């Protein structure tokens, strides 16, 4: 059993997946810092000095009545809050990660197309009725003509 586990763990796919998970976690940390430290502060400044990390709505006061100076103070008092700013930061982070993954997949697909060449066509035009038919068809389903 140990031998089988070693073979699995040393295979390229398992190692590639482990590296991907580790890099993905690190990338998430970088994106979080990018959003929290570089993107949201200027947006908050443009919107009148709003600190998004402390943008919240108090649903119910805690032990000490509000208003609270910060989200940390509200949580310390035990208040129930809607953390709108934290959610906004998370949405921006997700958008950045999703866009980065999109660019990565798009780049890999472009590279794959260049290496493999264009894909073989899957459809052809019937020479009689010009309908699109499968390239493997021997008879047109539209006009019933025999295809060469």
Swiss-Prot record:
InterPro entries the record matches: MS_channel, MSC/AndL, MscL_channel
GO terms, molecular function: mechanosensitive monoatomic ion channel activity
Membrane topology of this protein: Multi-pass membrane protein
Statement: the UniProt record of this protein carries the keyword Glycoprotein: no
Ranges that cross the membrane: 15-35, 84-104
Record localization: Cell inner membrane
Highest taxon in the source lineage: Bacteria
UniProt GO cellular component terms: plasma membrane
PANTHER family: LARGE-CONDUCTANCE MECHANOSENSITIVE CHANNEL (PTHR30266:SF2), MECHANOSENSITIVE CHANNEL MSCL (PTHR30266)
Subunit-structure text: Homopentamer.
Protein name: Large-conductance mechanosensitive channel
Protein source organism: Nitratidesulfovibrio vulgaris (strain DSM 19637 / Miyazaki F)
């Amino acid at each position: 059993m140990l031998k089988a586990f070693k073979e699995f763990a040393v295979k390229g796919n398992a190692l590639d997946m482990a590296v991907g998970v580790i890099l993905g976690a690190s990338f998430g940390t970088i994106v979080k810092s990018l959003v929290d430290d570089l993107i949201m502060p200027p947006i908050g400044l443009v919107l009148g000095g709003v600190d998004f990390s402390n943008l919240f709505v108090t649903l119910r006061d805690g032990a000490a009545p509000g208003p609270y100076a910060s989200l940390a103070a509200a949580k310390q008092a035990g208040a129930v809050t809607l953390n709108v700013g934290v959610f906004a930061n998370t949405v921006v982070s997700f958008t950045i990660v999703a866009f980065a993954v999109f660019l990565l997949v798009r780049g890999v697909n472009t590279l794959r197309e260049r290496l493999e060449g264009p894909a073989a066509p899957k459809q052809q035009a019937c020479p009689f009725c010009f309908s699109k038919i499968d390239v493997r068809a021997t008879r047109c389903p539209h006009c019933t003509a025999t295809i060469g």
